[in-house]
Amino acid sequence: KPTKYEKLWRIHWLSELNIFLGPPGAGKGTQAVKIASEFGLAHISTGDMLRAHINNKTDLGKIAKSVMDEGQLVSDDLVIAMLVERLGSDDCNNGAILDGFPRTLPQAKSLEDIRYKFPVSKVFVFEVDEEELVQRILLRGQTSGRSDDTEESIKVRFEIYTQDTEPLIDFYNQQDKVFRIDAVGDIDEIYHNIAKHFN
């Protein structure tokens, strides 16, 4: 059982956050799982976190569900509240990888509000050529039976990603936290290019 002082230490423990940024199909989820497992970090997918809250009918989940039922987007403040709660878990003691958040500059600035407790350490930007990305996602759609991905829809998503994340990357670049990762090629090679920044 932790002592009073250990509890106080836990409260002030700095869990460093590592952000994985990249367009859909860039392979960031695959690498996040591998890196998290190797270095004892928590892998936090904001999409999974949101679904878990809704499925478990938590207070935050109920708010999120009512917002989504009205066809609205869940607010950044609500996602941050879920994130703060998640980061308080024991598996986050060594730090965490954020997969899917932040996606925009306002979200990054919301994350700054909790930086004294959970500072952002590194931001990995997964870079993939648009045509390579289109082929990857179309191939994935064929093998998984997903037919909702068309070349046009993928290109639109890539364009939105680029527009949203360019200011975000600039924001973290100014803090010297950005590492650009060539996300084309062998999965193990890409993994080692990321892992060397954790050693």
Where in the sequence are the language-model features?
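Glycine-rich phosphate-binding loop of ATP-dependent small-molecule kinases
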Residues: 1-199
